[in-house]
Every structure is written in C-alpha cells, then in structure tokens.
Amino acid sequence: MSGSRSIRGVIVCAALSAAVLLAGCGSSRTAGTAHPLSGPGLQGLILKPQKPAPPLALHNYSGAPVRLSALRGKAVLVTFVYTHCPDVCPLIVSDLAAAQRGLGHEAARVKILAVTVDPRRDTPAAIRTFLAARGATGRMDYLLGTSAQLQRTWKAWDVAVNTGPNKLTDGHSAVVYGITAGGRMAVVYPSNFTPAQIIHDVPLLART
C-alpha cells in the first residue's frame, strides 16, 4: 500500500469507527464528537496503526523554511485552513492559540502548523490580520508554498481542496492532526475539539 493511500485508510477508519464526519468549511463545527479510543490517555481520535507522518516542507508567511522532519523531539499539530474561511477555520485557529496559551511552560514542547488551502488570497498581510484577530500571532506557523509544493502537500496529507475557478469558498477537510515527537501520526481531532483536549494531549505526544 502506498504511503498516501495508507494514511488515507488510517484516518478514514479512525473517523468512521468513532462515527465522526470530517467537517469542511460551511458545515457545522459540531458535526462530530471526539471520543477517546484505546491508547495512552489521548483524548483525540487515536489512529491505529500509527504511521510516519507524511512529508511537509513549505515556508511560513515571513519566508522562513519549515520542515516537519526538522521538528523531531516536539509534538506537532497540523491543520489546513484559509483566511477567508467563513466559519470553522477561525474557530480552529482560535482554539489552537488558546491551547498554546494554556500549555504554559509545556508550550515549548509543541509546534503548531497551519497550511494554506487558498494560496491566492492568503497573502502575508491577510495572514497577519487573520492571526492577530484570533490571538494567534507568534503561536503558530502559517505555511505557504509554490503551487507544486502545496499540491504535493495536500495530496500527501489527503486533504480535499476545492480549487475550481467558480468556487465561493474553499471546501476542505477541517481537522487537526497530532504527531508524536518521533514523527508518527498518533491522533486526529475533529473540528469540534476543545483547547483542553490539546492541553491534555501535548505532553503525551511530546514524549512518544
């Protein structure tokens, strides 16, 4: 089984086993409820078996390169958003920022990555405004890339992005992926996650 197909199968099976719909922008943030499954006390949806996280090599909106492979030793949270999202993306970013604040000294053990699904409108200026409005400035890296880089990333992470020319909004999978310090996909959080779940799980992800 290919790496991309394997990741897709793991994520889909985990979501279906908990009867969770992977919500997209324009859908209700309460479309599903995260239930802890068997595992080391994690409160998201635990992925079994745990697979190495797909590659991710982009740059933040200031131009600095960011590689997932360089973040070994930290827990990493990855989500896919866009600044013009009318509903779920602002909530995801706000809740991730709240979790990062709530972690206190443990915040040094996690890196939060938000990958654009709308590179045309996600300009550095738009990103700065978006993050500032949600208390997320300096609390996560908002990642951009060339069209080819982003297409590769979306495919590797099995992110469905509506790139049609007549789209009104960018429909996409609205979840957060939790990655261990060893670089393995351990857990997925549906869009109705709480900051408390992230605060609980980060120390566990950071030591595995």
Per-segment meaning from a language model:
Residues 77-78, 112, 176:
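Hydrophobic beta-strand anchors of alpha/beta hydrolase catalytic cores
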Residues 33-69, 94:
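N-terminal "domain-start" segment that seeds a small globular fold
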